Amino acid sequence: RPRAFGEIISRLTAMPPALSPKMVTLFGSPPKDTAFRFTHSSEAIIELSSRIMDWAPEGMKKVYYGLSGSDANETQVKLVRYYNNVLGRPQKKKIISRDRGYHGSGIMTGSLTGLPTFHQHFDLPAEGVKHTVCPHWYRKAPVGMDESAFVSYCADELEKMILAEGPHTVAAFIGEPLMGTGGIIVPPAGYWAAI
């Protein structure tokens, strides 16, 4: 019998048939089979990692699991800092995010978040975090600018910020493909290619 709360098991019966047996098996598995990814592996983790790698760009060979998006973004910041320290570039630590972007609510991830309510009363954003224009054409484009011109405007603003800060100090840019918390904002066509 699976070791899980009865309520959870009863909810599993309402899940699609293909999913529920696997979920019941996971709930009945020892915690090491699902939780301790640094010291143990499991069939479930190997299968999920394989599926993720099927979607990943060529050259990517590893999957890192975090507990949340905030945790994942915090880890990325640490990796950026570590990488530049190892290469002897301790000044290359600045990260550019976007206004209205959401990356978490911790000290660093809250700093990357481009929403003032996440900064108020917490002395955020932290040093080294900058915010560039949000790709919301309807609200952020100068009057009379079409979407194509706005894409160029966003890319130019980012480049100006990098040059103003000093390319030798800017380590990364972070942005969600589709901005959710900041207002369900879909960037105009061509935005990511320009960025």
For the regions a protein language model found, what residue spans apply to each?
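Alpha-helix capping and helix-loop boundary segments enriched in small/acidic/polar residues
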Residues: 40, 145, 149, 182-186
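PLP-dependent aspartate aminotransferase-fold enzymes
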Residues: 47-172, 189
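Glycine-rich phosphate-binding segment of PLP-dependent enzymes
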Residues: 4-6, 18, 26-40, 47-67, ...
